[in-house]
UniProtKB/Swiss-Prot annotation:
Name of the molecule in the record: RNA-directed RNA polymerase
Lineage, uppermost ranks: Viruses, Riboviria, Orthornavirae, Kitrinoviricota, Tolucaviricetes
The family this protein is said to belong to: Belongs to the tombusviridae RNA polymerase family.
Keywords annotated in UniProt: Host membrane, Membrane, Nucleotide-binding, Nucleotidyltransferase, RNA suppression of termination, RNA-directed RNA polymerase, Transferase, Viral RNA replication
Source species of the chain: Panicum mosaic virus (strain United States/Kansas 109S) (PMV)
Further facts: Readthrough of the terminator UAG occurs at position 426.
Keyword hit for Transferase: yes
Length: 992
C-alpha cells in the first residue's frame, strides 16, 4: 500500500498540480480502493491498466469483505468524495473509521446518512414556512412526499449508478464520465465554494421521480384495492330479511339428518282468490275462478322443492350450466303448476336451486352405504364365487384327497380345465321374421279376395343388438291376410267417427266422410292466385324429365320412355299394382298395426304425367308461400333450414302457441271432389290439354290388383290418393295448406303454417289458441278430412314436425329425430345381412347418414359415431332401394352435411326441453356409446337381446311440459264500449 501511495504521489507531482493530502488518500485507498482507483484512472498521466491490476489485487487479498459494500458506493463516487473530504468533521471521520473495522455495512449506511444530512437544513425552513400558510391536510401530504423523496434518494442512489456502470461495462470509468474536475480539487485539499448543477446525475433524479410516482400509484392502488375488498365483502352480506330466510331453509334441511320428514307441499300454501268464479242458476260456470297461492312457510316449501328436484334428476346433479338451466326450469314448472304467486316463485326457486346441487342427509346416507365395510364385504364375497382355484392349488392345499390328484393329472395330460357354468357371449346380429296381422272383419262389395292354400312369403328384419332397447320393431309380411286388411281399412273404411252408423260386421269402421257439396269453391280464390303466380307452362321433354332421377329410378323410367316411343300411353297403364309396404313397425306402441299398402301405377303413366307436373312443383310451393306471406311448404329443406324457419315463426309472436294436427290417414280421405279441385290447378296452368285431362281423369276412377304367394285381390275405388302417384306429395301440400288458409281467414286470426304434406303445425298467438282448437276439427270435416289436434306447445323445442323437434345447436335451431325412437329404429334394417361384413357395411352407412343430420347433438352424435367406429367401408350398400327409403331419405332430400363437434351447455339444455333427457343422462349415454364394442357374430338367443350395461336405454324420459304464458283472452266482440277518458277521471275521483 505504501508503495502504491508513493507511486501515486510521484505521478501527481510530475503533473502541474498542487500537493495531494497523502493521509486522506491513504485512508480512501484503505477503505475504498476500487472507487478511488477508478477516479485516479481518470487523471492524465496515470496508467489505467496499472491501477486496475493494483485495485483488483487489493480487493481480492485485503478487502474482499468490503467488495459488496464498496459496490453500493460506486453509484456516485465523485459526490461522496467531495462530501467526505470537505463536509465531514474529523470526529465524524474517526467514528466512521471505527465502524468500518467492526461492521462494514453498518458503517457505510451511517456514512451515507451523514452525507444526506448536509442537504436537509433547507427542508426545515421550508417546512416551517409552509406550515403557516397551507391547510393541515395539504401540509401533511407535502411532508409525506418529501420524506418519500429523500427515502427514495437514500435507497436508490447506489442502485442508479450501479445500473449505469453495468450498462457501460466499465465501472472504473464512471467517475470520469460523471464529474472529472470536482474530485481532483477535493483530493488536492482545495475548498469548493460553488456547486456545479451537473454534479448530480439526471438519471438519479429521473429514477427517484419514478420511484415517487410508483409509490404514490402504489398507495392509490392500495386504497382502491382496499375499497374493492370492502365493497365485495359488503356485497356478500345478505340483507337481514334474506339472511333470516336462508337460516330458516338451512334449519329445515338440517332436520332431515335428525329424523324422517313427511312434507305435503299444499300445506305450505295459502290460497288467495283474485277473481271469484261466476256460476249461473243452472250451475254452469260462466267464468272460472282466478286465484294464486302464497307461500306461508318458506323453509318447508323450499325443502319440498329440493326433494322433488332431487327425485327428478336422480340425486345430486353435476354442477354444470346445462343442469342449472334444467333444474331452474323444472322448479318453475312445479311452482307454476301449483299456481304460486310469481314473487314467491322467484324467491323459492332462488333459495332452492343451490341446495339441489348440494348433498342432503339422504344423499350422504346413500354414499355411506355404497362405501361402507359391509358393502365391500358383500361385494368381495360375491366376487369370490367367480374366482377359480386351479387343480395344483387344490393339490397343494389338501394332498390327501384323491380327487385333487385326479384333477391335477387331468389338467396335465388331458388339458381339460374344470370350469363352472359359463354363458357364451351372444353376437349382436339378430334376424327376426315378419309379422302377420289379425284378419279383418271389414268387407266391401268392390273388393274381391281370392285366398290360396299356400304359405305366405316371409320377410325378415335384422337388428344390431346393444344400440337401443326402448322399442321393439317388426316388419309386415307381404301376405294375403295383410293385404286384405290393408285394403279394407286403409282404402275403403275408416275408424267409425259416427255415432249412428251401424255396420254389418265390424261396427268399429265406417266409410270415409264426404265433403260438403261445393265446399271446395271457397278455395277458388287461392287457386286463381296460384295459377297467376306460376303462369302458363308447357310439358317438358323426356330428357328433362329423366334428369330429375338417378340410380334405379332412372333405369326404370328410361325403359318407360323407350316403351312410350313405340306405343302411346293407355288406360291399362293407370291400373294399380298393390303390395304391402316394407316399413319398420313400432310393435311396442301398436302391437297389431294395420299394414300400409303401396299402390303404384305403371312407369309409363308416371312418365307422361310427370312431364306435366315435375317442373311446376316448386313454383306452386312458392306461390303458396306468397299466399301465406312466408315460408310454408317445407319440401326439399334440410334440417337446419327447417329448424331456423320454425323458430323464426315462433319469434313473430310475443306469446306464441304451436298447434300440431295430423290428418288421420290423409290419403284415404281424399275425395273425388278434392281430386277434381287439385286437378283443376294443374290443367289451368297448362291450358287444359287433352292428354293431361285424360291422365288426371284416370286418377278419379281406379282399378287395381294385388298378388301374393297365398292370394289374389282385385278392387275398384273412386277417389282416394294413391301413394305411388306422381302428384301425391304435391297434391297433399296444396289441399292441406289451402284448407288451413281458409280456416285462418274465416276466423280472422294471424297465424303461420308449417306444412309438409299431411304433417302440419299452425303457429299463432296464445290469445287465438282456444278459437283455433275449437274450429279445427269441424272445419276439416267440412272438406271430408279427419284431423286430430295435438296438445298445444309454447316453446320451440317442443314443436313436433315430421317426427322431429327443433334443438338449438349453439348457433341455430336444427330439427332432430326423437332419440327414444331412433336409437331402437336405426338399429333395425330391412336390408338383408348376408354376412357379418355386410352388417358392418350397413352399420357404417347408417352412422354416416345419421351423423350428417345430427352432428353436435347430445346422445345422437355419440350414437352414430359408435356405428361408424364399429362398421367398415360401406361400399355401395347405401345406394340400395331398401336403404334409400329409410333414414337417408331425409338426408337425400335435405342435403344436410353436419360434422361432429363439441356439444355446448345451451344445446344440452335445449335437448332436455325437447326430449326429456337431463344433461347428466345425456353424458351417461354418450359415455356408454363411446366405449361400446359390438360382437359381430350371429345371435342365437331366440329373444331380443337387452343391454344390462346401460339401463337408460330401456327407460323413456318424461318430456318437461311448458305451461303457456299467462294472458287474458282477447274479447273479439266487446259487450260494452269502453268508457271515455272523462268518465274514467270522474270514476277515479269518486270516493270509495
Amino acid at each position: 500500500m505504501e508503495s502504491l501511495i508513493q507511486h501515486i504521489l510521484s505521478a501527481t507531482s510530475s503533473l502541474s498540480m498542487p500537493s495531494v493530502d497523502s493521509d486522506k488518500l491513504q485512508l480512501l485507498l484503505t477503505r475504498f480502493p476500487q472507487a478511488t482507483l477508478s477516479w485516479l484512472s481518470g487523471i492524465d498521466g496515470l496508467s489505467v491498466h496499472q491501477f486496475k491490476v493494483v485495485a483488483t489485487h487489493v480487493i481480492k487479498e485485503s478487502y474482499s469483505h468490503l467488495s459488496p459494500s464498496v459496490a453500493v458506493l460506486l453509484a456516485k463516487p465523485s459526490d461522496y468524495y467531495k462530501l467526505v473530504v470537505h463536509g465531514l468533521t474529523q470526529k465524524q471521520w474517526n467514528e466512521f473509521d471505527d465502524k468500518v473495522t467492526d461492521a462494514p455495512r453498518t458503517a457505510i449506511s451511517w456514512l451515507y446518512n451523514q452525507i444526506l444530512v448536509v442537504g436537509q437544513p433547507w427542508m426545515k425552513s421550508l417546512n416551517e414556512g409552509l406550515k403557516e400558510y397551507l391547510p393541515g391536510w395539504l401540509h401533511t401530504c407535502l411532508r409525506m412526499l418529501a420524506n418519500l423523496w429523500f427515502g427514495a434518494e437514500r435507497v436508490l442512489h447506489g442502485i442508479s449508478h450501479a445500473v449505469s456502470d453495468i450498462t457501460t461495462y466499465q465501472p472504473w470509468m464512471s467517475c470520469r464520465r460523471c464529474v472529472a474536475h470536482s474530485p481532483k480539487e477535493s483530493l488536492l485539499g482545495e475548498a469548493t465554494t460553488t456547486s456545479n448543477p451537473r454534479e448530480s446525475s439526471w438519471f438519479s433524479w429521473l429514477l427517484c421521480g419514478g420511484v415517487v410516482a410508483a409509490t404514490v400509484y402504489g398507495f392509490y392502488k392500495w386504497v382502491t384495492i382496499t375499497e374493492t375488498i370492502d365493497r365485495q365483502d359488503l356485497a356478500k352480506q345478505r340483507p337481514t330479511h334474506m339472511q333470516k330466510c336462508y337460516e330458516e331453509v338451512k334449519a329445515r334441511l338440517e332436520e332431515e339428518s335428525k329424523g324422517f320428514i313427511h312434507d305435503r307441499m299444499e300445506d305450505e300454501l295459502t290460497k288467495i282468490v283474485l277473481e271469484p268464479a261466476e256460476i249461473d242458476n243452472d250451475g254452469k260456470v260462466l267464468k272460472s275462478e282466478v286465484a294464486q297461492y302464497l307461500v306461508k312457510n318458506h323453509g318447508r316449501f323450499v325443502r319440498s322443492l329440493v326433494t322433488m328436484a332431487k327425485n327428478e334428476f336422480a340425486g345430486v346433479p353435476k354442477p354444470t350450466e346445462a343442469n342449472q338451466l334444467a333444474v331452474w326450469r323444472y322448479l318453475y314448472r312445479v311452482c307454476d303448476k301449483k299456481g304460486v304467486n310469481p314473487s314467491d316463485t322467484q324467491k323459492s326457486i332462488s333459495a332452492a336451486l343451490p341446495f339441489v346441487f348440494l348433498p342432503s342427509a339422504y344423499d350422504q346416507d346413500q354414499a355411506i352405504t355404497m362405501n361402507c365395510d359391509d358393502t365391500k364385504k358383500v361385494l368381495e364375497r360375491y366376487a369370490d364365487t367367480f374366482r377359480h382355484t386351479t387343480p395344483l392349488q387344490k393339490l397343494v392345499t389338501n394332498p390327501l384327497v384323491g380327487a385333487n390328484w385326479t384333477a391335477w393329472a387331468r389338467s396335465i395330460f388331458i388339458s381339460d380345465p374344470e370350469t363352472g357354468l359359463r354363458f357364451a357371449k351372444x353376437g349382436c346380429i339378430e334376424k327376426w321374421q315378419g309379422v302377420q296381422c289379425k284378419r279383418t272383419r271389414v268387407r266391401h262389395p268392390r273388393l274381391r279376395c281370392h285366398f290360396k292354400d299356400r304359405d305366405p312369403k316371409v320377410r325378415s328384419i335384422y337388428r344390431i343388438a346393444g344400440l337401443g332397447d326402448q322399442y321393439e320393431f317388426g316388419l309386415h309380411n307381404n301376405s294375403a291376410a295383410n293385404l286384405e286388411r290393408g285394403l279394407a281399412e286403409r282404402v275403403y273404411m275408416v275408424k267409425n267417427y259416427k255415432t249412428d252408423f251401424v255396420a254389418s260386421l265390424d261396427p268399429a269402421f265406417c266409410p270415409a266422410p264426404e265433403p260438403v257439396r261445393g265446399i271446395f269453391k271457397r278455395l277458388d280464390k287461392y287457386k286463381k292466385e296460384i295459377v297467376r303466380r306460376v303462369g302458363r307452362k308447357s310439358p317438358i321433354t323426356d330428357e328433362m324429365f329423366l334428369s330429375y332421377y338417378d340410380g334405379p329410378q332412372l333405369t326404370t323410367y328410361s325403359k318407360a320412355v323407350i316403351s312410350l316411343s313405340e306405343r302411346p300411353v293407355a288406360v291399362q297403364d293407370s291400373y294399380l299394382k298393390t303390395f304391402i309396404k316394407a316399413e319398420k313397425l313400432n310393435l311396442t306402441l301398436k302391437t297389431d298395426p294395420c299394414p300400409r299398402v303401396i299402390q303404384p301405377r305403371h312407369p309409363r303413366y308416371n312418365v307422361e304425367l310427370g312431364k306435366y307436373l315435375k317442373h311446376i312443383e316448386h313454383p306452386i310451393y312458392k306461390a303458396i308461400d306468397r299466399i301465406w306471406g312466408g315460408k310454408t311448404i317445407f319440401k326439399g329443406m334440410n334440417v337446419e333450414a327447417m329448424g331456423a324457419e320454425i323458430h323464426k315463426k315462433m319469434c313473430k309472436y310475443s306469446n306464441p302457441c304451436a298447434i300440431g294436427f295430423d290428418a288421420s290417414r290423409f290419403d284415404q280421405h281424399v275425395s273425388v271432389e278434392a281430386l277434381r279441385f287439385e286437378h283443376s290447378i294443374y290443367k289451368s296452368i297448362h291450358g287444359y290439354p287433352e292428354l293431361l285431362s285424360l291422365l288426371l281423369k284416370w286418377q278419379i276412377h281406379n282399378q287395381g290388383t294385388a298378388h301374393t304367394n297365398d292370394g289374389f285381390f282385385k278392387y275398384l275405388v273412386d277417389g282416394k290418393r294413391m301413394s305411388g302417384d306422381m302428384n301425391t306429395s304435391l297434391g297433399n301440400c296444396i289441399l292441406a295448406s289451402l284448407i288451413v288458409k281458409d280456416l285462418v281467414d274465416s276466423l280472422g286470426v294471424d297465424a303461420q303454417l308449417v306444412n309438409n304434406g299431411d304433417d302440419n303445425v299452425l303457429i299463432c298467438s296464445v290469445d287465438d289458441e282456444e278459437v283455433v282448437v275449437k274450429a279445427l276439427y269441424d272445419h276439416w270435416m267440412k272438406y271430408g278430412f279427419e284431423v286430430v289436434a295435438e296438445q298445444p306447445v309454447y316453446i320451440t323445442e317442443q314443436i313436433e314436425f315430421c317426427q322431429m323437434k327443433p334443438v338449438f345447436d349453439g348457433t341455430q335451431y336444427v330439427l332432430v329425430r326423437n332419440p327414444t325412437v331412433t336409437m331402437s329404429k336405426d338399429a333395425c334394417s330391412i336390408t338383408p345381412f348376408y354376412t357379418a361384413n355386410s352388417a358392418r357395411k350397413w352399420c357404417r352407412a347408417v352412422g354416416e347418414a345419421g351423423l350428417s343430420l345430427t352432428g353436435g347433438m347430445p346422445i345422437k352424435q355419440a350414437y352414430y359415431q359408435c356405428m361408424i367406429r364399429n362398421g367398415i367401408n360401406k361400399g355401395n350398400i347405401h345406394k340400395s332401394k331398401e336403404f334409400r327409403y329409410g333414414l337417408s331419405y331425409v338426408l337425400h332430400h335435405g342435403k344436410s352435411d353436419r360434422k361432429a363437434r363439441p356439444i355446448s351447455a345451451a344445446t344440452r339444455y335445449s335437448f332436455y326441453l325437447a326430449f326429456g333427457y337431463t344433461p347428466d343422462e345425456q353424458t351417461a349415454l354418450e359415455g356408454y356409446y363411446d366405449s361400446l364394442e359390438l360382437e359381430w357374430t350371429e345371435s342365437r338367443l331366440g329373444i331380443p337381446a337387452r343391454t344390462p350395461e346401460c339401463l337408460l336405454l330401456r327407460l323413456l324420459p318424461k318430456i318437461p311440459l311448458q305451461p303457456k304464458s299467462p294472458t287474458k283472452p282477447v274479447q273479439r266482440t266487446a259487450s260494452k264500449p269502453d268508457l271515455p277518458d272523462s268518465q274514467w277521471q270522474q270514476a277515479l275521483a269518486a270516493p270509495l
